[in-house]
Swiss-Prot record:
Coiled-coil ranges from the UniProt annotation: none
Name this protein carries in UniProt: Probable G-protein coupled receptor Mth-like 9
Superkingdom to which the source organism belongs: Eukaryota
InterPro entries in the record: Methusela_ecto_dom_1 (IPR044860), Methusela_ecto_dom_2 (IPR023311), Methuselah_N_dom (IPR010596), Methuselah_N_sf (IPR036272), Mth_GPCR (IPR051384)
Disulfide bonds: C29-C82, C84-C89, C93-C181, C94-C107
One Gene Ontology MF term: G protein-coupled receptor activity
Length: 513
């Protein structure tokens, strides 16, 4: 049977080889500065004439990909030239004589042809002038981005400045030429204006809400588990209970931040806040898996009857936290490096969390999680076989009843298997989506799986915890039993409504109104 670790390694190497192959091709300029010149006029010297601009051969190259939302996708090989380096470019959302339909999100033919020949241009000295578009810019019609932001109800949507180099200012932000496109829009009845539509990375809809609602319910369940484990002294003091508490605390904080990012438009967050929230969520979630791995190792050492001193245990926890902090800064360095975009996590760019359109999430997120879960599974398997190596008359193991340790171990192992299955599903779904180039920024099935794990945690981590069950039997069930005995003794009435018990301190009384 092929190890999942080997499969992940093969996938990672194939991805890396493909990305290096793409990055190694020498392109004369950035994709955002190019235009498809296949339909241009080829000159005798090998140059191309396109929209009145002569593109020399050294500024042309064949491209086997296209860029949408800043991410490369496979495409038929075509010729592109660095036209925008020779003359500023602006993008139109739709071909000539078509307009963008904000209701159906496509290009449609208007009832009356809307010619867009002029645009307001803002100069460096802040003066504004109406200029003929094709005199100042090369017009290109490309997708650029899948989702376009349209908000005709607010006045600031109609307020923007187009500069001489093709960049656009709106909402106190500069947008490059591949982050917006122009289209005529109806501002007032029968009054159309040429308006730029910015690329919208934030998505809403039923997927987001299903994910958010399921995650919030899961967080509430985990908070209940955490509070009950923390309130029971024996559970709180045991090594197993401590690690589960640390795990739940990290997971609650991490998923709470992810839900916040799912519901919050990144455009309404500063770059620093967006980036820091994403990295904090990453740190907490990775730390939760480290605690699961430590708990698995702790069970293995117990069944091997290898005692670990408290100082060593505290040191190992501190080193684990430091290792996750180091991993967090390693991912931050990768984000700020000059690596190809496919190797970057993408935090703080289009999204505050990982960009699922690149391979970075597999390298920095799914990869470490898979390694930690494989380590946990291996430790649990070794611990399981170590149980049968114990002497038959063993009652206690390192000062704890063997029955308690075994019960907790079986419940924890079942939970680990569930976590492993959920995350293998996550990785497989991501790889299939990445290969097909069909992405969902929010996968609502992830929220359903998170909720399922919370329910499993309630049953296995809380319901099967013998310390909690003992506390519940003493403090809750016994109290209810005593109360029911008292009630049964006090409130025994005969058919007439009088008390049956003659020794009851409560005597029937007659009250008149």
């Amino acid at each position: 049977m092929v190890s999942p670790l080997i499969i992940l390694l093969i996938i990672w190497l194939s991805v890396g080889a493909k990305s290096v192959e793409i990055a190694s091709i020498n392109h004369p300029c950035a994709y955002a500065h190019t235009v498809n010149i296949t339909d241009g006029l080829r000159m005798k010297d090998g140059s191309y004439s396109y929209a009145g601009v002569v593109v020399p051969p050294h500024l042309m190259a064949e491209y086997s990909f296209k860029v949408i939302d800043g991410v490369e996708y496979r495409a038929k090989k075509h010729l592109r030239g660095c036209v925008c380096l020779l003359k500023p470019c602006i993008s139109f959302c739709c071909p000539e004589n078509l307009v963008f339909d904000a209701k159906h999100w496509n290009c449609t033919m208007p009832h009356q042809v809307r010619e867009s020949t002029h645009v307001e241009l803002t100069y460096a000295n802040r003066t504004v002038d109406q200029v003929r578009i094709r005199d100042r810019f090369v017009v290109r019609t490309e997708l650029g981005c899948r989702n376009k932001f349209v908000d005709k109800k607010h006045d600031n949507f109609w307020q923007w400045d187009l500069f001489e180099n093709g960049t656009l200012r709106r909402d106190n932000r500069l947008w490059s030429t591949d982050e917006y496109c122009f289209s005529p829009l109806e501002h007032n009845p029968e009054q159309w204006e040429l308006t730029p539509l910015n690329c919208e990375r934030f998505q809403t809809g039923y997927r987001v809400w299903i994910y958010a609602i399921c995650s919030i319910i899961a967080i509430i369940i985990n908070i209940f588990i955490l509070s009950l484990l923390g309130s029971v002294r024996d559970a709180r003091k045991s090594h197993y209970g401590q690690l589960i508490i640390y795990y739940l605390l990290s997971m609650i904080v991490g998923y709470s931040l992810l839900v916040y990012l799912a519901l919050k438009n990144p455009m309404k967050l500063s770059h620093v806040a967006c980036r820091n929230i994403g990295f904090l969520a990453y740190f907490c979630i990775m730390l939760s898996f480290v605690f699961l791995a430590i708990c698995s190792l702790d069970f293995l050492l117990k069944f091997k009857q290898k005692a670990v001193r408290s100082s060593v245990r505290r040191l190992s926890l501190a080193l684990a936290v430091l290792a996750v902090i180091g991993l967090r800064f390693l991912v931050s360095l990768a984000q700020d490096s000059k690596l190809p975009k496919h190797f970057k996590p993408g935090m703080g760019e289009d999204y505050c969390w990982f960009d699922v359109r690149t391979w970075g999430i597999l390298i920095y997120y799914y990869g470490p999680i898979a390694l930690l879960l494989i380590f946990s599974i291996v430790c649990c398997l070794k611990a399981y076989f170590s149980i049968y190596e114990l002497p038959p008359d063993t009652q206690y193991i390192l000062g704890t009843q063997l029955k308690i340790v075994k019960t907790h171990f079986y419940a924890f192992s079942a939970y680990i298997v569930g976590v492993f299955a959920v995350w293998i599903r996550e990785i497989v779904v991501y790889i299939m989506a990445r290969v097909r180039e069909h992405f969902f920024i929010i996968d609502f099935w992830s929220g359903i799986c998170i909720l399922g794990l919370a329910i499993a945690g309630f049953i296995l981590l809380l319901g099967k915890n013998l310390h909690v069950k003992s506390w519940w039997a003493i403090n809750v069930e016994s109290s209810q039993t005593d109360l029911s005995i008292i009630n049964a003794r006090v409130y025994k009435f005969d058919e007439k409504g009088d008390l049956k018990s003659s020794d009851s301190p409560y005597k029937p009384t007659v009250t008149s109104l």
